[in-house]
Amino acid sequence: MKLAVLYAGQGAQHPGMGKEFYEGSPAFRAAFDSAELDFDLHRVCFEDPDGLLNQTEYTQPCMVAFACGVTAVLAQQGVKPAYVAGLSLGEYSALEAAGVFTAKQAIELAAYSGKAMAEAAKGIDCGMTAVLNLDRQALAACCEQAAQLGCVQICNYNCPGQLVIGGEKAAVDKAAALAKEAGARRCIPLKVSGPFHTRLMAPAGDALAKRFASESFGEMQVPVLFNCLGREKADADSIPALLVKQVQSSVYMEDTLRRLGELGVDHILEVGPGSALAGFVKKTLPGVVCASVETPEQLNAALTAWKEEL
């Protein structure tokens, strides 16, 4: 058995995520509570009475805190992945799992990233749209044609048949209309608070570069596959530059999954919340066994099913 652990990105968050783990696992609590933030992490993540969880400056640290907690539980259970990766924001969680960041560092960096991205998005009439069943080249041509109206790029290569475009709303809407004419089955506008993974996020990249200059990183203990490359990179010194590039560049998740297949991965554990990545795995690597983990019950079920192979 060769296991990879994948970490979810923004969009899967919901109030209450991680609460069962927090109440039942000291290891989860220690990781979750390790960061110093300027808001009440428990209140936003577990209850969210003020509706803050879907704002990126809150979403990001909440998601990473949840993921770091689950990683601590996995380590306690003796789970040792051969590879780790994350979708977008999930890359911070993957780097924590690999030993590059501490849990405290990953959560605090995610909080900083969220604020930087929210600031970069201010004043931009932005949009992101999922495009189904149109190939990369055809969609790229649609974006190129629509770019006369503003910035529009393919920002996520999720899996076969699912791409996401983003940028300035007028250009995104035009590219989506052209995509339908070119044969796309559906174009689904997404609820987002910024034009993520486009060049409009360059100011966020600049802010992150300054922050990373003051950070120290641990040695990579597990190979990480990076969003902007779609493959692993062993050179830990390049991590800051890759994260700066990631925030303003396309996420190659389909390429990442195909690379995991090439590396012999036959089991994948998705650390949620949600199961979006499991859907991508099913479409990209149909022969790979995949389980999604959001609750202790789901984790125990996966580990029990895989016990003999682990």
Where are these regions (language model features)?
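FabD-like malonyl-/acyl-CoA
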Residues: 1-139, 144, 190, 267-299
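Alpha/beta catalytic cores of group-transfer enzymes, especially the acyltransferase/condensing modules
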Residues: 11-12, 37-42, 98-249
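Non-catalytic positions within long, well-ordered alpha-helices that form the structural scaffold/packing
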Residues: 75, 180, 258-264
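Generic hydrophobic alpha-helical scaffold/packing signal
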Residues: 225, 244, 257-261, 278, ...
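Short, flexible loop segments at boundaries between secondary-structure elements
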Residues: 229, 289-310
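Amphipathic coiled-coil/heptad-repeat helices and related helical stalk/stem segments
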Residues: 252-253
